[in-house]
């Protein structure tokens, strides 16, 4: 190849690279503009259903940069339990109503492949004892043959950092192949409810009966779930409509399903058809990385969010139209 040919080839390569980079930047800009337009349009349509009030309770501690699940203790007043998303060890964190870290508990015998949600309810063998149910159910790549829910007797944060033993494990498979899930709730009858988060499939919920939970907690036997049922939440990533957590109210008759941009409310238990309790509560850009949700006894909702480049996430409380006090 001549020197001129080498120069021409190099020039073409550099020029081609520049064109490629410009094209990528342009495509990203177009996509970003479309998403911004979709969010703006959604805000105009849904703004009337924003929370009637919202207050910051505190900023999440550095140890909880990816806070995911959230429950409010009924045994220890003013205590909130949470955990990190994938990337952390099997740890539970107790925080107070200002998001101040109270204690950290290592869970012996548990793995933390992708913890995504948690629920609070009676222990399988003792309804008088409070247990934390932690869902290791994240599966963005749809590659996990089975997932699991860990059961831990609720510890006392006043003892400080410590280790807790695993009380039981509920391993399970879905009837139709892998799912990615980010929601877990426990009913007044101690059934477990798992809610999916998927970009191209309608949101579903699967139930694990209390009797199966007790059996699995004793022997760790694999549970094969029955067919799930759909919730009327069509995923739309451009406006943040992807499920990140769920919660049942204290009466057990309202299921809140939060996404990045909205909170949906459904009558529970679901009978022949799924019915909404109220219009979805529009969060908009309040929590672009919103994750956890839990009902207070007064019907207001406590929310958590992950850290962003701007700083730590928040612990917030909101009141949504048509729900709670």
Regions found by a protein language model. Name each.
Residues 4-325:
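Sequence/structural signature of beta-propeller domains
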